[in-house]
């Protein structure tokens, strides 16, 4: 019985270690996704900001932080339109290079000139009053995945 219990505990512990964990930081309609193996040290400053992978978040702006098993693909931004709203998911490795604002289904992304690699933006969903605006001087890829904007 003790061997079975020990084996069960070991299997559960290993399955937890082998599954990917992602720290999600939600600010308004934007979710920044940081893979646990990349997040490193997260520093808090004066109880008002947190630094994660060189992205600074004002804690007063953060709606929630949670951990899940979502897979994060580096250099990816996903924009999903749903009627009069849009949500944006940002890979943690490019979060510090982007300034994002979302108002309803209107998405505006400014890409820093400091970004070293191409970022892929994937747009999907539908909206009768949606917009996507992106600015920046570095090369980017725009994927339209069943997108309907009118």
Q: Where in this protein do the model-derived segments appear?
A:
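Short acidic, Gly/Pro-enriched loop/turn segments at secondary-structure junctions
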Residues: 47-52, 69-73
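Short, isolated positions in well-ordered beta-strands
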Residues: 32-34, 57, 86
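Sec-dependent N-terminal signal peptides
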Residues: 4-15
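Boundary at the C-terminal end of the N-terminal hydrophobic targeting segment
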Residues: 18-25
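A composition-driven surface/loop motif
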Residues: 69-150
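Structured surface patches comprising rigid loops and adjacent beta-strands/short helices at the edges
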Residues: 35-44, 58-70
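Residue-level detection of beta-strand-connecting loop/turn positions
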Residues: 29, 53-54, 146
């Amino acid at each position: 019985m003790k061997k079975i219990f020990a084996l069960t505990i070991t299997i559960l512990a290993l399955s937890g270690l082998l599954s990917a964990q992602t720290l999600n930081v939600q600010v308004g309609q934007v979710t920044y996704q940081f893979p646990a193996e990349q997040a490193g040290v997260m520093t808090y400053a004066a109880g008002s900001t947190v630094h994660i992978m060189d992205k600074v978040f004002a804690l007063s702006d953060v709606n929630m932080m949670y951990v899940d098993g979502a897979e994060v693909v580096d250099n990816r931004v996903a924009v999903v339109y749903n009627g009069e709203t849009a949500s944006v998911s940002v890979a943690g490795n490019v979060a510090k290079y982007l300034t994002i604002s979302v108002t309803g289904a209107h998405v505006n992304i400014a890409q820093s000139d400091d970004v070293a690699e191409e970022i892929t933006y994937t747009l999907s969903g539908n909206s009768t009053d949606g917009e996507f605006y992106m600015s920046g001087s570095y090369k980017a890829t725009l994927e339209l995945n069943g997108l309907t904007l009118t």
